Amino acid sequence: MNKDYQIFWPSPSDPVRFEVDTSHEKVESISESDTMNVSNLSQGIMLSDSPICMETTSTTCDLPQNEIKNFERENEYESTLCEDAYGTLDNLLNDNNIENYSKNVLTQPVDTISISSLRQFDTVCKFHCVEAFDDEMTEKPEFQSQVYNYAKDNNIKQDSFREENPMETSVSASTDQLGNEYFRQPPPRSPPLIHCSGETLKFPEKSLAKSTAKESALNPSQPPSFVCKTAVPSKEIQNYGEIPEMSVSYAKEVTAEGVERPEIVSTWSSAGISWRSKASQENCEMPDMEQSAESLQPVQEDMALNEILKKLKHTNRKQEARIQELQCSNLYLEKRVKELQMKTTKQQVFIDVIDKLKENVEELIEEKYKIILEKNDTKKTLQNLQEILANTQKHLQESRNDKEMLQLQFKKIKANYVRLQERYMTEMQQKNKSVSQYLEMDKTLSKKEEEVKRLQQLRKEQEKVTASALDLLKREKETQEQEFLSLQEEFQKRDKANLEERQKLKSRLEKLLTQVKNLQFMSENERAKNIKLQQQINEVKNENKKLKQHVARSEEQNYVPKSETAQLKEQLEEVMKSDITKDTKMTHSNLLLDCSPCEEESLNPADIERSSQLASKMHSLLALMVGLLKCQDITNSDAEHFKESEKVSDIMLQRLKSLHLKKKNLDKELLKHKDRITTFRDLIAKEKAFQDHAIKVTDCDSDEAKSIRDVPTFLGAKLDKYHSLNEELDFLITKLGCLLESKESHCNRLIEENDKYQRHLGSLIKKVTSYEEIIECADQRLAISHSQIAHLEKRNKHLEDLIRKPREKARKPRSKSLENHPKSMTMMPAVFKENRNDLD
């Protein structure tokens, strides 16, 4: 409620206090204690012991008795006006308001009546305190601020009381609104507010101001506009039917003065102080009036007569106003009778309400004892439930622990299952790879088996060729024997001619012996050289071993490139070729030296065998190196190996064919030369036998000697060719054997790897089956754990239902009793609430 009040506080010279309401809104409602105390207030105003009467008597002691009587009449009139105002308030309340009031009393608690009575007593005390403070306020203006603060505190208390008792404030608000409307409506002939002069000041104004101050003290919640609207005219009362405009003009003048001297105070304190100041002004002005009257009596008798006439007119007007006031008082008395009747009805209603409240209290006491019994029962049930809860909590903790253990086991099994799945996937991938490798190995094995079959067929063909060659050699041998017989015949014929030549040859033999000695010396030197060559060969073997080790390391590291392997092959071939050429030269030289026709010792077969052995060893070393390099090539790339092996096999077959042809030719020539050599040896032996018996031979043909010397050189050259061809054949045969051995070893390796893979597959299959069994066991455990969890959840639900049932049983009777008597909820003990919270 926003209200703007302009309070004009007059100076000591101003006789009247005015208040103007600028809000044009509704006034705040008065409290219920003021409405219930209307009758007491009206009686308190009439008492002579009250501070109002004391003040009036004190102020009127210096005045004449007529004016005192008039003042008492006006005071009674104002008290009746106040009673009329409060009576109209009570009459304006309808029966509906009474019914609402009775209902509100029924719904209120028992202590509200005592509180309202205390509030009534408090308001009366405040009224007397206000009247007592008014004198002090006039004498000591320092108390004005204290009174203002007290009014604020009183307003705050009433607001808090209204918040605590909204039902009472609603009833009082309705009555206050009606009362405010009544006081705002001016009477049909409201006395105007007239400017006060020092001559014509009378005390009804003061009494009316006092009554308004009392009303404002009784109703501190009312604004100052309420006081202004119920104010009585300040000086001589004119005709009530006339409404002069002086009040409005005077109000404007006062507003102007009030703006210059604004002093805002609370309603009841400002009223008391203003009327005290007015009384002091009147006391000061009365002796002045008497002096002026005494001085002007002899001089202005005419003026006195006029004044008497005016006074008579004024008294007439007063009488008319008095008649109207009496009529109003009659109406007020009628209303008062009705009000008393309503009060009696209200008292009966209150008695009925009190009886009902007593019955309710008895019922509440009975219910209290019932609730105490129920409380004991519930305590017992709660103890049982607590025991059950303790057991259930133990079971729940055990079940939770089991559940956690099962969850941990499940997580472990799940992790193991995931790992097994990953291993299974990796093993399946390895299995697929091994299967693909196994299929590839099968293909390579099948190809190699086909190659082996081809080589076996070639071997059989070679054996057939060798058999046919041997047959041819036998035939040639027979032919040579026949030729030998023919040659023997010719030799016998020539023996005779040779006898002559022997003598010539003896002389030449001596020369030849010297040459043979020289040749022996040369052969010894060459043998020393051969020993050195053997040492070099041993060094080469060591180097070959080192190279083999280096090749093995390179195979492990797979770091040796193909270009280096090719260079190593070429270097080894060059070295071996150089060694072979040296060996062949040495053998040729040995053969040439040993095959001298002069001495049998020159033809040493041990040297020939050694040279052949050395050549065969060198060929075998070369074959081993080639085989190693080819094995390396096989390990590096199988496809290249197969291609190279096919090419090599084709080339070798062609070479074998050509070598077989050459071998046949050489075998034929060898047989011939062997026969010739045997013949020459026989001749040499015969010549040695006949040396003792020989005669000096002088005649020897130089042509025959030359032919004899040329035969060993020719035979040596052919033997060299034959040896070289045999070495090449042996080299090719060893090479083919190495290839076959490498292929067989490779096939064996593949078979072993295949067996390993099959074993690995078997172990993998076993592992997979074992993993599947483990997974099945884990699934079974999971199913068991799920079933256990479901069983535990069912048990928990069952236990929760058991816990809820006694709660619901305890709540049902309470809800019924609370529906009938909501006040019984306050009797619930705190212990039961704590137990209930524990259960929750």
From Swiss-Prot:
Keyword Coiled coil: yes
Origin: domain of life: Eukaryota
Region (Disordered): 800-840
Keywords noted in UniProt: Coiled coil
PANTHER family linked to this entry: CANCER-ASSOCIATED GENE 1 PROTEIN (PTHR36864:SF1)
Full protein name: Cancer-associated gene 1 protein homolog
Composition bias type Basic residues, residue spans: 806-815
Ranges in coiled-coil conformation: 303-559
